[in-house]
């Protein structure tokens, strides 16, 4: 499948959580975003807001104390929790406090998006690795983006999620080559060596002009929806948050036994189609002035129209 029209019927049936009067707050998805540092505060905001615009009910941001006030000031809709401080020079306390703070929240989530604005502090990555272990033990859906992908390229962490099939990775071309250095696939045409034993169970969303969904070293589908021509910073974070919503819906439908784990790539493809459409609308509206907030503005309407099309 390439465009939304190629697969919309099955995608709506198996990937979009129905709305009905029996739902309560949180029934349509609770997404956590682990990211945000003193230097990077926009990325976790874009990811969390995208999850809400795509249809999730609640969005949490777990970030550095230094990022808390800026992110809170961007929107009252986000629940923002400081989980560590960059000024804490006790490495054991920093890691333990971060793991405990986030660990208490994991049972309340349907999906955890990790990486937007995270930074590459070794202590933070050490704590994140422990959080991922906890999430895996609870069968929580995970979306890894940005600095979390860099972390997974490091030998010390690479096998930490080996065999986990509720994992989505979202590399761009550069991140993909860092994750899979043996791959000679610069144009996305050949999938040989596109994965390895450690990450073979993951669903990989390789971002580009045509987003490609890769599972077990082979491309299973691609998103050929037309997007905008402007590559503004933050659009990848919008996709990460949208994937957070769709993987949350997958988790909810999985609990209802309405879908199987094999439907996760289809959920990712649907999220890619939605963001491409929103990006195209934003670009048509703003052209060169388009930025990530413009994509957020169009995301909900684009997704609603997609699911209502005859």
UniProtKB/Swiss-Prot annotation:
Q: Name one GO biological process term.
A: nicotinamide nucleotide metabolic process
Q: Which residues bind ATP?
A: 207-211, 227-236
Question: Quick one: which residues bind (6S)-NADPHX?
Answer: 117, 172-178, 237
Q: Which GO terms describe its molecular function?
A: ATP binding; ATP-dependent NAD(P)H-hydrate dehydratase activity
Q: What class of enzyme is it?
A: lyase
Q: Required co-factor?
A: Mg(2+)
Q: Which residues form the YjeF C-terminal domain?
A: 8-306
Q: Which PROSITE patterns match?
A: YJEF_C_2 (PS01050), YJEF_C_3 (PS51383)
- Which reactions appear under catalytic activity for this entry? (6S)-NADHX + ATP = ADP + phosphate + NADH + H(+); (6S)-NADPHX + ATP = ADP + phosphate + NADPH + H(+)
Q: Which CDD domains does UniProt cross-reference here? A: YXKO-related (cd01171)
Query: What's the Enzyme Commission number for this chain?
Result: 4.2.1.93
The record, for Gene3D superfamilies, names: 3.40.1190.20
Q: Report the protein's function.
A: Catalyzes the dehydration of the S-form of NAD(P)HX at the expense of ATP, which is converted to ADP. Together with NAD(P)HX epimerase, which catalyzes the epimerization of the S- and R-forms, the enzyme allows the repair of both epimers of NAD(P)HX, a damaged form of NAD(P)H that is a result of enzymatic or heat-dependent hydration.
* Family from the record: Belongs to the NnrD/CARKD family.
Recorded protein name is: ATP-dependent (S)-NAD(P)H-hydrate dehydratase
């Amino acid at each position: 499948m390439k465009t939304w029209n190629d697969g919309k019927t099955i995608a709506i049936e198996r990937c979009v959580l129905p709305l009905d009067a029996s739902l309560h707050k949180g029934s349509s998805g609770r997404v956590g975003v682990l990211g945000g540092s003193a230097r990077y505060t926009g990325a976790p905001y874009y990811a969390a807001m995208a999850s809400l615009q795509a249809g999730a009910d609640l969005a949490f941001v777990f970030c550095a104390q230094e990022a808390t006030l800026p992110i809170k000031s961007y929107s009252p809709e986000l629940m923002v929790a400081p989980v560590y401080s960059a000024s804490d020079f006790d490495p054991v306390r920093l890691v333990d406090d971060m793991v405990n703070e986030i660990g208490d929240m994991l049972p309340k989530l349907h999906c955890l998006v990790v990486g937007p604005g995270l930074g590459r502090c070794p202590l933070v990555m050490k704590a994140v690795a422990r959080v991922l272990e906890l999430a895996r033990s609870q069968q929580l859906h995970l979306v890894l983006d940005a600095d979390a992908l860099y972390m997974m390229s490091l030998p010390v962490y690479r096998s930490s999620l080996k065999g986990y099939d509720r994992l989505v990775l979202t590399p761009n071309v550069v991140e993909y080559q860092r994750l899979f250095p043996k791959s000679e696939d610069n144009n996305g045409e050949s999938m040989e060596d596109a994965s390895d034993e450690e990450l073979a169970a993951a669903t990989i969303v390789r971002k580009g002009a045509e987003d490609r969904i890769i599972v077990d070293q082979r491309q299973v589908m691609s998103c050929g929806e037309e997007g905008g021509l402007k590559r503004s910073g933050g659009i990848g974070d919008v996709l990460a948050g949208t994937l957070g919503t769709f993987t949350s819906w997958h988790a909810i439908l999985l609990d209802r036994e309405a879908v199987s784990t094999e439907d996760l790539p289809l959920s990712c493809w649907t999220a890619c189609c939605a963001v491409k459409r929103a990006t195209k609308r934003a670009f048509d509206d703003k052209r060169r002035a388009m930025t990530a907030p413009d994509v957020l503005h169009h995301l909900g309407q684009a997704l609603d129209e997609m699911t209502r099309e005859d």
